[in-house]
Amino acid sequence: MFQRILVPTDGSDITAKAVATAITLAKLTGASISTLCVKEPFPYSAISEMQPVPPQEFYDAQERIAAGRVKAVLDAAAAAGVACEGATVEALHPWEAILDTAKQKGCDLVVMASHGRRGMAALLIGSETSRVLTHSPLPVLVVK
């Protein structure tokens, strides 16, 4: 049925449900999992000398947080006996990074949460999940 499942993570509680669902599906189908955490690019402004955090500090913090989120998925998969690989990537549009990663890794299913950390912004500009659903050539399982 499925051979490689992509489960993006942002560390939210709802994403933890998507991870658990992906692990269960992987166990049932013998699939492996790829996980991905998308980091936001540095928020440059017109007044660049007034940045509250230096760019390298921002990048280091983003990587540390993203790597921790990926490690949580890797640990959960390992505890369940499911093969899993993970990555972090910087992207302006997380949905594009999700679809690019799915293609690069040869995934045949994306399992993701119905919403993530963006809260009200997602209601105003549309969620990453809806963009993945709209543009994905693969099946997408949305977990609520």
Range-by-range predicted roles:
Residues 3-52, 76-85:
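Small/aliphatic-rich secondary-structure junction motif
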Residues 109-134:
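Glycine-rich, Arg-bearing micro-motifs that act as flexible, cationic patches
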Residues 18, 45-48, 96-99, 122-124:
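Short, well-ordered secondary-structure micro-motifs
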Residues 1, 139-144:
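Short hydrophobic/aromatic patches at helix-to-coil boundaries
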